[in-house]
């Protein structure tokens, strides 16, 4: 347990460096550095990915061996949230190879790297907002709505910057049967797994809120008085 939280936070924080490199390069509009930033960012991404992987694995081992929860992974909402940056970073590592070899997917890589860091804030939102019931959740403290607004604005700005980076896509992608094609398919699969968790979680929450508004709040039961 002593290594589990630090490794997770080192993994989350480590993604900030390649994310800043990607966004800075896209905003600078320097064509000479279009491919160079991936060479600089890849070691940082791999290091952060490795630390996050170790943190997730140690957390599963600790839950099974020490807490006796009966499994390594309970599909807890906060546990799944820690997996989201790992999935996006894995997809980004695949698409970085395509940018280096084919001079394509510049905008995709910029957006994925930014989304990796933003997804770490999404995990914080789940823990601190009080919107989920989890053994990892804490009191909200009023940070849920501001943090959610920050996440939405960051996603919108990152998407706009990624559109600017698409101007450097001068190469051609190979067919689906090629190695690059399989890398793209793998990346799409990882992103689909990433999108599934927040979509299902928030849709289910909206449905519960609608049901509550339709039927009204449940009446509170009065405590029974003991016999005298």
What is each model feature region?
Residues 1-228:
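Polytopic transmembrane helical bundles with strong interfacial aromatic enrichment
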């Amino acid at each position: 347990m002593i290594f589990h939280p630090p490794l997770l936070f080192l993994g989350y924080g480590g993604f900030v460096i390649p994310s800043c490199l990607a966004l800075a390069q896209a905003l600078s509009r320097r064509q000479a550095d279009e491919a160079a930033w991936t060479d600089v960012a890849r070691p940082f991404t791999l290091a952060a990915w490795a630390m996050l992987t170790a943190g997730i694995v140690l957390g599963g081992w600790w839950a099974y061996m020490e807490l006796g929860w009966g499994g390594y992974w309970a599909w807890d909402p906060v546990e799944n949230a820690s997996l989201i940056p790992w999935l996006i970073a894995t997809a980004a590592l695949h698409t970085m190879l395509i940018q280096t070899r084919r001079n394509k997917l510049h905008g995709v890589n910029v957006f994925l790297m930014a989304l990796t860091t933003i997804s770490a804030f999404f995990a914080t939102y789940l823990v601190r907002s009080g919107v989920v019931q989890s053994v990892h959740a804490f009191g909200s403290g009023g940070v849920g709505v501001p943090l959610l607004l920050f996440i939405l604005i960051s996603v919108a700005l990152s998407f706009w910057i990624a559109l600017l980076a698409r101007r450097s896509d001068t190469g051609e992608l190979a067919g689906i049967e090629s190695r690059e094609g399989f890398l793209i398919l793998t990346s799409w699969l990882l992103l689909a797994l990433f999108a599934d968790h927040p979509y299902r979680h928030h849709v289910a929450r909206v449905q519960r809120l609608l049901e509550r508004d339709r039927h009204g709040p449940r009446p509170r039961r009065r405590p029974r008085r003991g016999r005298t």
